[in-house]
């Protein structure tokens, strides 16, 4: 899978731009504030319906306009597909895939699997469990079609259950919701567990390349004791949940744990090593996606020279090339990337004041 054409309108400081990306590495360079990261953000927005830089989508629309427009041509297994998105300042979103209107953003995400490696993505190991659940669920969503609906149902039931707890509802009235919660939680947990097990197999060789002589163990915690029946646990914890007004255990508390020996990786590894570990995790996800559903991710790598030294830049870029994925990588100076590549990028773009120029 790859983008063969990308059109951006009134997105951040880009009034209008059209790119014809190539396979493999696409280098985008320019000074800070030029708009190079906005190109990556636009691709992400097209695939996810939101930004990786701001939770307020209206902020990416140019002040002089009331909407942004993004569309792209995709090459998917030698077949062309078209996707388009329009976001209005009012919050309304219009999405089309091959000319047909799409109501759910999950359909958009399924069409364009995107991996992001930015300075902020390294927070995966430092933030709370939510970001690591999202990491697992990206893969679970793309690799198993039954995951999304099951997880949507879990979140819907949890919302209802928590409201009943806040209303001090008796357990006999909550039991119906608990049966449904257990049913969907088992589906979600089974898919997550199988996905993490498969991811572990992919990770072994990749971590060895990035962190030789470091033995990183990855394990999945489901959000409650695996030896305890979830239905019994919900009943047992009802008094505590009633007091707090929230469901204390379940798949919404799941986490991905990474350790070196008995220590969390945050305590055992240097900051530089942790960055390499996150890169390894992202590459493993891309390789697993290709293995399981024969679809490549699109990688967005922002400000790579600022995050890794020359040796590890070269290693990361080569690993990305080996995945067969299309990659968009930004830098202030092109030499920082060009010097790390054995062969030139398939396309090079220069960005200045929101204007994009192809470098032949």
Curated annotation (Swiss-Prot):
InterPro entries: DNA-binding_RecF, DNA-binding_RecF_CS, P-loop_NTPase, RecF/RecN/SMC_N, RecF_2. The keyword Acyltransferase does not apply. GO terms for biological process: DNA replication; DNA synthesis involved in DNA repair; double-strand break repair; SOS response. Its main location: cytoplasm. Keywords: ATP-binding, Cytoplasm, DNA damage, DNA repair, DNA replication, DNA-binding, Nucleotide-binding, SOS response. GO terms for molecular function: ATP binding; single-stranded DNA binding. GO terms for cellular component: cytoplasm. ATP binds at residues 30-37. It holds the Pfam family SMC_N. It is found in: Cytoplasm. The RecF protein is involved in DNA metabolism; it is required for DNA replication and normal SOS inducibility. RecF binds preferentially to single-stranded, linear DNA. It also seems to bind ATP. PANTHER family: DNA REPLICATION AND REPAIR PROTEIN RECF. Belongs to the RecF family. This is DNA replication and repair protein RecF. It comes from Shewanella sediminis (strain HAW-EB3).
């Amino acid at each position: 899978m790859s983008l063969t054409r990308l059109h951006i309108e009134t997105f951040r400081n880009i009034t209008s731009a059209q790119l014809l990306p190539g396979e493999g590495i696409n280098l985008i360079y320019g000074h800070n504030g030029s708009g190079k990261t906005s190109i990556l953000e636009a691709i992400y927005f097209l695939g996810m319906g939101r930004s990786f830089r701001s939770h307020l989508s209206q902020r990416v629309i140019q002040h002089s306009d009331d909407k942004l427009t993004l569309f792209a041509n995709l090459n998917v297994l030698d077949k062309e597909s078209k996707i388009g998105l329009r976001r209005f300042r009012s919050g309304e979103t219009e999405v089309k895939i091959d000319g047909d209107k799409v109501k759910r953003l999950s359909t958009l995400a399924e069409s364009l699997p995107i991996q992001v490696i930015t300075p902020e993505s390294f927070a995966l190991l430092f933030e709370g469990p939510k970001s690591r659940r999202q990491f697992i669920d990206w893969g679970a969503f793309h690799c198993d079609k039954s995951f999304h609906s099951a997880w949507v149902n879990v979140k819907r039931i949890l919302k209802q259950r928590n409201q009943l707890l806040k209303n001090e509802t008796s357990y006999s009235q909550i039991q119906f919701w608990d049966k449904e919660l257990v049913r969907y939680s088992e589906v979600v947990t089974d898919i997550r567990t199988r996905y993490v097990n498969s991811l572990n197999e992919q990770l072994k060789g990749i971590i060895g390349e990035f962190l030789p002589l470091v033995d990183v163990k990855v394990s999945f915690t489901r959000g409650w004791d695996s030896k305890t029946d979830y239905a019994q646990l919900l009943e047992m914890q009802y008094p505590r949940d009633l007091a707090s007004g929230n469901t204390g255990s379940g798949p919404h508390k799941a986490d991905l744990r990474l350790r070196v020996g008995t220590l969390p990786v945050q305590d055992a590894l240097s900051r530089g090593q942790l960055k390499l570990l996150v890169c390894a995790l992202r590459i493993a996800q891309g390789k697993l996606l290709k293995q399981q559903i024969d679809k490549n991710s699109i990688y967005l790598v922002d400000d790579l020279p600022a995050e890794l030294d020359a040796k590890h830049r070269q290693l990361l870029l080569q690993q990305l090339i080996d995945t067969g994925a299309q990659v968009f990588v930004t830098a202030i100076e092109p030499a920082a990337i060009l010097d790390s590549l054995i062969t030139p990028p398939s396309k090079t773009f220069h960005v200045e004041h929101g204007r994009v120029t192809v470098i032949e």
